[in-house]
Amino acid sequence: KKTYFNKNSLKIISVGRLVDQKDHMTLLKAINEVKKKIRISLLIIGEGNNKKIINEFISNNNLEKSVKLKDYTKNPFPYIKQADVFILTSKFEGLPNVLLEAIALKKFVISTDCPTGPNEILDGGKGGLLFKVGNFLDLGKKIQFFKNNYKLCKKKNYYAQKQLFKYDSSNNLNKYYKNIVEF
């Protein structure tokens, strides 16, 4: 089974287009900060016009051994399953399906507290960790928190998994149908 992660490291994954909205630079800056304290292996899956800037940052900060890029894949689940934590760094989102998918795959989530989506999915932080949009130092602290508080984070992840039914389309359709019938 092919892996993009280094052994004996904290395995982090991020999946999303390599564009300004997804703000991968915040993630890379956070990794650059915490790499001095924690052995990290990061896989970013996606394609987009920021790929060159991302590769330059990786090269300029000697992150080649810690950070790998993989082009878009229709099914990122096998890669997400190999990770310890999923990180979303978006400046804004609608309903980030990839966050729901990561939780369904029992991955702990660290996400930006961007307008709409992550805060609701993570129930204000009860189901994962939230950090300020664009704040790589805050993200770095959250990564360290995960590494140092694994049992607590496992409980948060379990809470998030129990909340997933809210986003099940058949469950939502049943609610709408019930409302229509009662109307």
Question: At which residue positions do the language-model features occur?
Answer:
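Aromatic "clamp/platform" in nucleotide-sugar-dependent glycosyltransferases that forms part
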Residues: Y72, K91
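A short alpha->beta transition loop at the rim of the catalytic pocket in nucleotide-sugar-dependent
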Residues: F77, D84, K106
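Short acidic/histidine- and often glycine-rich active-site loop of Leloir-type glycosyltransferases
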Residues: E101, C114-G125, L129-L130
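Conserved acidic donor-binding segment of nucleotide-sugar-dependent glycosyltransferases
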Residues: D123-F136, Q144-Y150
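A conserved mid-protein helix/loop that constitutes part of the nucleotide-sugar donor-binding site
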Residues: L10, S14-E33, N49-N55, N97, ...
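A short, well-ordered alpha-helix in the C-terminal region of glycosyltransferases
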Residues: D138, F145, L152-K166
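Short hydrophobic beta-strand element within catalytic cores of glycosyltransferases
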Residues: F108-T112
